[in-house]
Amino acid sequence: MPDQSDKNVILKDFFKSTVLLSELDEILRLKPETLIGIDKVSSDQLITNGIKTIGDLANLSASDLPEIRDILPSMLQKWVKIAQLIHKNVKEQLKRHKKVLMIGLDNGGKTSLLAVVQDKFSIIKSLLPTRGVKREKLDFFGYPIISWDLGGQIMYREKLYFNRPELFFTEADIVLYVIDSQDPDRFTEAANYFREVLKVLIELKENPEFLIVISKSDQDIRKTLQWQQNVTNIKNKFSKVIKEFEQFSIDFCDTTVFQWETVMQMFSIALKKVSDTSEIIENILEEFTDQVDAKAASLVSMDGLIFGNYTDSETDEMLVNNTALLLQTLSNFYNSIGLVREKSIKLDLPLNGFTVRGEKLFEYSDLQIPVYLWALVVEPKKLEHKLDYFKQQLLPLINLFL
């Protein structure tokens, strides 16, 4: 069976040599004349009859074709079948990619969040607001993701997105709605835009997962009364909107690009919402914490994806996750200067009577990304006899996470 790169080559063979196929989701929006065998005159005739794209051509029934002047029925039938073959191939490939939709007002911080998860810290200060739509095929934590970053300027919202919503809001697995926590003058505008997005999704019969991302929650700002009031204001305004649309599952999360771990945790929450195995992973972690008398446990990839965690305490969850992410960052630094990565990483806090310890279980994806099982424990030795048992249970679930 051909792999994805082979299929991309196969798709390219249907198109004229001058056509560049950069993004899968753009293929079905190309004009008919981009296909080999369809000249400009025939393409114009198709467009005149409402068949403007390869997607439109694929939607025709080969057994009930329209009559189009100067185009033989047999020729049209062939083109339709080719378009349908391309359509099927594109849709199959897209199903293997989770679609993440980044929405929010301009200057909200959407593109900066994507830059952090791609380790592009140096470009954040020079980023300009996204104009229109920026689509990227990304390797998120070793999994294929299609990211749609929708610029938030009003002219794009009114004249582009809501004019042709089916082009932008369909087949999204999760929507990240980003709002600037430091811009209270636009909270009402942001909530109204959010409402319009939900209305469009209902009209399109789409039901993606949602995460409202309260961005620019910088560490120094978080300590102020103003920030706390802003967050309360945001949640109040958005909660009123959410009550109007009870069919959606919507959560809140705050981040800052100046603390990498907050961005990783935000994306982890988002991906867990659309994962096929995250719930099972967390059930296994619950069993693990019980057997080793741990206060909390998390399964974390070396590049920052938290596959799942279990604890009875929100404080313990923050403690184990933040410690894991920071110690793994230190491990990555050691590895970058030529040191061998340790299989066991720990931080002892004797005055507090516990240890945070991470044990490497396995690697996943073609990128061979290490995965560590982290636990907040009083007696770390209890972990040693249980690791192989839980490793065998967790490995297949990680491979099927997305």
Regions found by a protein language model. Name each.
Residues 220-283:
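Canonical P-loop GTPase G-domain recognition
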Residues 312-361:
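A charged amphipathic helix-loop-strand protein-protein interaction module that recurs
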Residues 99-119:
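Glycine-rich phosphate-binding P-loop
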Residues 1-91:
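Compact, charge-rich alpha-helical regulatory domains located at protein termini
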Residues 297-309:
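Short hydrophobic alpha-helical segments used for membrane anchoring or interfacial signaling
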Residues 145-176, 180-200:
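Switch II of P-loop NTPase G domains
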Residues 94, 117-144:
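Switch I (effector-binding) loop of TRAFAC-class P-loop GTPase G-domains
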Residues 172-178, 201-218, 239-254:
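Conserved beta-strand/loop subsegment of P-loop NTPase cores
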